[in-house]
Amino acid sequence: FPLVLWLVPTTTIRKQTVDALKNPRHPYRAALDDAFSGRVRVFDIGDFSQLLPHDLRSNCGVVVGTIQTLRVKDTDGRKVYAHHEMLEPHFTGVPDKMPGLEMIEAGRGAGTIKFSFANLMHLHRPLMIVDEAHKAVTGLSRDMQLRVNPTAIIELTATMRTHSNILHSVSAQELKDEEMIKLSAMPSEHMTW
């Protein structure tokens, strides 16, 4: 089953996305349930310790987090990059020196694989969805992508960059017709400006 890492720009959008994906009546969840025969598990990134190997083997897993949670220069002090014993079952059978995985640098366990959320993502090569991707274009974003090791990246944006590989485009009218525009746009001309 696939694993999806869905990254959004703010905590508010993260909560809204998690709520939508957990709601069986929401169109997003309904589409996932149809595609995977109801075998879908949705997690907030803050609850990554609840991920079990069985969840990832037997279900489509969707982990929703903010871009800022993973996009850092220094990984020290970030929970998603820290060693967590409860993630050990995910690393059973993984070779000791697997390329791309962060290792414990000092102290007990030095030189062994760090049982971290980021390493778990690296192993599973998730599909990465980046909401409002135009806000996520930095060198740090590329570093984060290398750490996570996604199979593919889908960028959702209203502001495409040049040289983007556009798979699908939606007009503002189509969004309005589907009631996906949250604020009404009422442009007016101000002669005093």
Q: Where are the predicted features?
A:
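RecA-like P-loop NTPase motor core of helicase/translocase proteins
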Residues: 1-193
